């Protein structure tokens, strides 16, 4: 076994971490003793200036490279001398502690004519993590997984942050910690595909997962699962589940709450077509079954799934009798929410293409999405809610009770008829020049509301503090909403009557005053 301590520098590496253990070229040797073997990567290497220090016992050398020895630690430092990876606690007389085999992968065996095996960084990783290992991550976002086969019954301590673990061989135990954490088997479409032989079967309620090699993994505090290139089975729990199936004819059973299936990664794994979604082909006893053709042309079964992320291509979304949320992104998509209350979200680009502001008019009979931010005209039928982009959007809603989330950018929003709610969920969304053209502040029939996620804003609580006037009246440091009728603008003043801290939220055209009935603090 070995213990691997990953530092925050690992997730910020610019190049494939397999190259951390590939030493082809004019490698600089800093130490070759019976207990220490140290080398530095030369200019031109992906990790030029990085130093690998191996310590242990019984080190011997042949032609300048290790031929024997038992490893006790391997430390990788960057050019500034800061540790990136620290391996230690190796079990003696195992593959992982064999210096000769590790060095053979790191340096390869090519002669002067280029004949023989080259360096194999993936193989070196596989040797170091060939036992029952403990991998300790950081309190940051550890999105970069370890490399190699990573065989053995391993324990992953992911700690805080939004983390990602690559599923590997063995009966592993994964502690996600706080944050949004995932287990991914997408590497079965690449390096790990040669040894994998089956799809995963995961149950979020029991925290058990049969992996692609037949091992049984146990997990805690994991929120998202990414499947394999085979036929996968996903079973959710009572909370919100987040699944990606990738290739294969997959089965998704969401369970309770609002559950999501994502297809945006299909493109990166070779999927070259849009998805076709029908979330409700039958409804028997409250069990809602549907079908989705994925980005590879495979047919997935969905049970009690409410949210779907599409692809970069032209997707077709048909909803269910439950509340649905769809994300289409780059392609020319079509949306039909069917029953209940349904939303389209516009904050995703699957290929990194820059998005412009969206233009939506739900009062049109057809082509309600005039511009999806990528230049496409799209159909949106039976859609009540819009979650807009981070650009300058123009949104005209219909006669339903709509929910509008403008996000960043200077958004111009028209609620239309109905009791509409306009929402802000991040401080960055303030001060961007938002405007609501028809906000209804009085009356009972179509009274509109302004929604705020109080945890996202300094000094805001679920207790409303509001004044209609030109400045805050609360004590210093006590935040307050200020609606100034002289310019029709609502401000948030996080400092109260103290100087500074006032930021414009939205202009409410022709509104004289606001009251508690106009606010939803959640």
Where are the predicted features?
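GD-rich hexapeptide-repeat beta-solenoids
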Residues: 1-32, 46-47, 79-97, 132-133, ...
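Extracellular beta-strand solenoids
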Residues: 6, 137, 146, 176, ...
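Mature extracellular "passenger" or substrate-interacting domains of secreted, surface-exposed proteins
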Residues: 8-131, 477-481, 493-494
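Acidic glycine/aspartate-rich repeat arrays in secreted/surface proteins
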Residues: 11-62, 271, 352-354, 419-522
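Low-complexity acidic/polar repeat-biased segments
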Residues: 64-114, 216, 223, 299, ...
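N-terminal helix-cap/turn-to-beta initiation motif at the start of protein domains
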Residues: 125-130, 235, 253, 413-414, ...
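Extracellular, beta-strand-rich repeat scaffolds characterized by small/acidic residue-biased motifs
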Residues: 130-132, 139-141, 148-153, 160-162, ...
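Fold-core signature of tandem repeat domains
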Residues: 165, 174, 183, 200-204, ...
